[in-house]
Curated annotation (Swiss-Prot):
Keywords recorded for this protein, A-Z: Developmental protein, Metal-binding, Nucleus, Repeat, Repressor, Transcription, Transcription regulation, Zinc, Zinc-finger
Domain of life: Eukaryota
Phenotype upon gene inactivation: Embryos show a down-regulation of early pronephric markers lhx1/lim1 and pax8, and disruption of pronephric development.
Any coiled-coil regions, as ranges: none
Intracellular or extracellular location(s): Nucleus
Organism classification: Eukaryota, Metazoa, Chordata, Craniata, Vertebrata
Pfam families: zf-C2H2
Function: Transcriptional repressor. Required for pronephric kidney development.
Stored SUPFAM superfamilies: beta-beta-alpha zinc fingers (SSF57667)
Organism: Xenopus tropicalis
Name used for this protein in its record: Protein odd-skipped-related 1
Entries under InterPro entries matching the protein: C2H2-ZF_Transcription_Reg (IPR050717), Znf_C2H2_sf (IPR036236), Znf_C2H2_type (IPR013087)
Length: 259
């Protein structure tokens, strides 16, 4: 029995007729000028992008469009029943960029290092202005440059700027303090105010912790003890003065031995 060959099914989407490999392979048999070969590779790459957009459901890019009929030999590869879809293309892929003679004659101004930041910002604006004057559609690089954050809108990282510390000034002597409590205690030296009074001997103090240390005098408890000699004290500052005596004695002993 002879095998019957079935006709090839008609593709659902016209762009599925062409693949990167088959498209370029078909062009090997056609007389295509050498200058149009990069355009064919660009068409193949953009065809793959269009295929992914169609299959995945992504919206198409709203960019300047041009037909592939300008590329020689494209219309002969596609069946006449299907219409060649238009893909987003950039003009430089089909037509080479032509430099205007006016721009080539202009000389670039000398860079001024004194105004570095100003010159950098002006250079970007000049580039955008030149593109608008030429009338050429914006490229992807130009669109990305426009969407970049300006230095003013960049999010700040790291610590916030430190707040200025408040200064509390004594109205009697003009001394500065960083805390209001320290200023309050200092001003009591000028006014001789002693709001904390002992209940036993009625001695008054400027600070509450001084009154607390004073109360140990009336009791037998001496919580502050010297580690050198074991002597106890009622106040911490009295113990600190006592420790200086031990350090002075240690400094005098080596000097006596040398003599």
């Amino acid at each position: 029995m002879g095998s019957k060959t079935l006709p090839a099914p008609v593709p659902i989407h016209p762009s599925l007729q062409l693949t990167n490999y088959s498209f370029l392979q078909a062009f090997n048999g056609l007389p295509v000028p050498a200058e149009h070969m990069p355009n064919l590779y660009g068409f193949s790459a953009l065809h793959a992008v269009h295929l992914h957009q169609w299959t995945l459901g992504y919206p198409t890019l709203h960019l300047p469009r041009s037909s592939f009929s300008k590329v020689p030999g494209v219309s002969s590869l596609v069946d006449s029943r299907f219409q060649i879809p238009t893909f987003p293309l950039f003009p430089h892929m089909i037509h080479p960029k032509q430099e205007s003679p006016n721009l080539s004659n202009k000389t670039k101004p000398r860079f001024d290092f004194a105004n570095l930041a100003l010159a950098a910002t002006q250079e970007d604006h000049c580039k955008l202005g030149q593109m608008d004057d030429q009338g050429s559609p914006p490229t992807i690089g130009g669109l990305l440059d426009v969407t970049k954050l300006t230095p003013e809108k960049k999010p700040t990282r790291g610590r916030l700027p430190s707040k200025t510390k408040k200064e509390f000034v004594c109205k009697f002597c003009g001394r500065h303090f960083t805390k209001s409590y320290n200023l309050l205690i200092h001003e009591r030296t000028h006014t001789d105010e002693r709001p904390y009074t002992c209940d036993i001997c009625h001695k008054a103090f400027r600070r509450q912790d001084h009154l607390r240390d004073h109360r140990y005098i009336h009791s037998k408890e001496k919580p502050f003890k010297c580690q050198e000699c074991g002597k106890g004290f009622c106040q911490s500052r009295t113990l600190a003065v006592h420790k200086t005596l031990h350090t002075q004695v240690k400094e005098l002993k080596p000097s006596k031995i040398k003599c």
